[in-house]
UniProtKB/Swiss-Prot annotation:
Catalytic activity as recorded in UniProt: n isopentenyl diphosphate + (2E,6E)-farnesyl diphosphate = a di-trans,poly-cis-polyprenyl diphosphate + n diphosphate
Cellular compartment(s): Endoplasmic reticulum membrane
Membrane-related topology note: Single-pass membrane protein
Natural source organism: Schizosaccharomyces pombe (strain 972 / ATCC 24843) (Fission yeast)
EC number(s) recorded for this UniProt protein: 2.5.1.87
Family per similarity comment: Belongs to the UPP synthase family.
GO process annotations (BP): dolichol biosynthetic process; protein glycosylation
Pathway info: Protein modification; protein glycosylation
Outcome of substituting residue 255 to H: Loss of function
Protein name: Dehydrodolichyl diphosphate synthase complex subunit nus1
C-alpha cells in the first residue's frame, strides 16, 4: 500500500516538475519570439527589408508558402496575406512565389488577388513601379503568359497535389493503351517535365504558416529538393517567420544525396 502511495506521489512530482519546466520554456520562447517580431518589424519599408536580406549568403529564387483560411479573416484575410507575402518577396528581390491554400479560395479569383497586390505594393514601394502577374497554373489561359515580370505568383490548392499525379498517370496509361506512345517513352524526365508544366516549377523554400507542421496535400513532386521551414510559435503570416525562413535557407547545405 505504501509502495503504491510513494509511486503515485513520485509520478505526480515528476509530472509537476515537467509541466512547470515546459510552461517556463514555452513562456521564454513566446517572449523572445514576440520581442524579435517587434525588433524585426518591416514597418512597410523596402529599405528595412533589403537591409535584413542583404547580408544573407544566398536567397531562394522561388518561395512557396502554405497559408490557412481562419474564421476571423476569411477570404479578405487570405488576400491580405497574399499581398504581404508578395510585397516581402519584391523587397527581397525574390521573383517567384507560390501560395498554397488547401481549399482553393484564392485560386478561384487570380484577377482579384492581382488587383489587391497592385493596390498594396505602394505602401512598400512608394511611387516605384513593379509588375506582378498572378496565375492559376491549371488554367489553359496561363500557358503563354509573359514571364518578364518583377514577381510571378502561382495560386494552387489541394487538387493540384496528388490528384495532378493521378490524372497524369491515367493520361499516360490511356495514351499507351491507344498506342499513341509506347511504355518505354514514359520516363522520369517526361513525368518531371509534365508535372512542372501542369502545376508549378519546383520551389527552393517552403514556409508553412500554420499551427502544425503538415503539408496539407501540397504537391509532393515539387518537394524533392525543397527546404521546409515552420515556426510552431509565430505560425500566422508574419515577416519575422518569413525572414527566419530565409536565414534557414541561407545556412542550409545542399548536399543533393552526397
Amino acid at each position: 500500500m505504501y509502495d503504491d502511495i510513494f509511486f503515485y506521489l513520485a509520478l505526480w512530482v515528476i509530472q509537476s516538475v515537467y509541466g512547470a519546466w515546459d510552461w517556463a520554456k514555452n513562456w521564454v520562447f513566446w517572449t523572445c519570439s514576440y520581442l524579435l517580431n517587434f525588433l524585426y518589424h518591416h514597418h512597410c519599408s523596402r529599405d528595412l527589408i533589403r537591409r535584413d536580406t542583404k547580408k544573407l549568403k544566398k536567397k531562394p529564387k522561388h518561395i512557396a508558402v502554405i497559408i490557412e483560411c481562419v474564421e476571423d479573416g476569411g477570404i479578405e484575410g487570405l488576400i491580405h496575406d497574399a499581398c504581404e507575402l508578395s510585397a516581402w518577396c519584391v523587397c527581397s528581390n525574390i521573383r517567384e512565389l507560390t501560395i498554397y491554400e488547401r481549399k482553393g479560395f484564392l485560386k478561384q479569383s487570380p484577377e482579384a488577388v492581382e488587383k489587391a497586390i497592385y493596390s498594396h505594393l505602394p505602401f512598400y514601394l512608394g511611387g516605384d513601379k513593379c509588375t506582378v502577374h498572378v496565375t492559376n497554373p491549371c488554367s489553359p489561359d496561363e500557358k503563354n503568359q509573359n514571364d518578364c515580370v518583377d514577381l510571378k505568383v502561382h495560386l494552387i490548392a489541394k487538387e493540384d497535389g496528388r490528384d495532378a499525379i493521378i490524372d497524369l498517370t491515367r493520361g499516360l496509361a490511356d495514351l499507351c493503351t491507344k498506342k499513341v506512345i509506347s511504355s518505354t517513352q514514359v520516363t522520369l524526365e517526361l513525368i518531371d517535365k509534365e508535372l512542372k508544366e501542369s502545376v508549378i516549377p519546383e520551389p527552393d523554400l517552403l514556409i508553412i504558416f500554420a499551427p502544425l507542421l503538415k503539408l496539407q496535400g501540397f504537391p509532393p513532386w515539387q518537394l524533392r529538393l525543397c527546404e521546409i521551414f515552420h515556426d510552431p510559435i509565430l505560425y500566422t503570416t508574419n515577416y519575422l517567420t518569413f525572414f527566419k525562413a530565409l536565414v534557414h535557407y541561407s545556412n542550409a547545405e545542399m548536399r543533393l544525396g552526397h
